Every structure is written in structure tokens, then in C-alpha cells.
Amino acid sequence: MTVIAVNQAVAAAKILLKMKLTPFNDKQSRESIINLLKENALPVDDIWENTLLFGFMDDDAFSGSAGLEIFGDCALIRSISIQKSLQGKGFGVILQKELEQVAQSKNIRCFYLLTTTAEEFFKKQGFMTIQRDEVPDTIRSTSEFSSVCPSSAIVMKKILVNE
């Protein structure tokens, strides 16, 4: 293992030890999360105030973020994003699991998402590919479904509790 790899592993371990998904509602945090999404080429045009944004930080910078739009007992996941230097180290899995705990505390029974790049990642997390017409109208009518993500995006669902 090279010195660089060891330093990266140590930095990742430090983040992991203090990582806790936290809601961020203030304007400055929202802007920082939006910048992280942009760095990862993820959509930000329709991140409104009703999108619950969560993240974890390393020092004063966001290292990971995720968003939820809640519709009754289901939620639309908005871009799970990890700082590029931390990608491939398991942080996305941890962030997604933390998001599930938040969702279950809000009595959310299922997640929906759209992806153009992360189908395999989400399959490993228990999501299944579905057709667009299987998504509830309230979620299908969001700008994420109707205009932000391309029609070629893959639609996925995960049941958090038995329906």
C-alpha cells in the first residue's frame, strides 16, 4: 500500500468515525450541498425548500449528501452524492442506510428513485427496477420525473416495510 493510499484510508476512517447523517435546512448548507451535487454532475434545478436535505461533513466541508421528497408514506430519493475523493469506499452505502433510518422514523414505507448511472449500486442495496407507470402519480408528477431526469433514466423502488 502506498503512502497516498494509506493517507486516504486514514482520512476515510476519520470521516467514518464521526459520520452521522444530519438534516441541513439553512441557506448556506443548502448551497454547499447543491455545490456537491454539481461537482458530481447531478441535477439541482428543482431542489426546493420542500426537499429534505441531509449530509455529513468532514471539517467544514460536505463529504456526502442526500435528499428526500416525501409523498405520504413514500419518498423520492434525490441524488445520493459523495465527495469524489471518498467514492468507492463504502460511504454511499452508509449514507443510503442512514437515509433509510430517517425514512422509517417518518413512517415512510418505500423509496423511489431515478438513475442514469447508479443502477448496480442501488440493486446491491435492495432496490428493484420498475416501470414508470408503477410509480404513484404524486411522485410521477414531480419535476424530477417529468423534466429533470431524462426519460431514459432507470426507475427503481425499495420497500422499507411490508406493504
Roles of regions detected by a PLM:
Residues 6-46, 153-155, 161-163:
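Short amphipathic alpha-helix that is part of the acyltransferase structural core
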Residues 103-116:
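Conserved GNAT acetyl-CoA-binding A-motif
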Residues 135-163:
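C-terminal "cap" of GNAT-fold acetyltransferases
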Residues 61-69, 74-81:
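Conserved beta-strand in the GNAT
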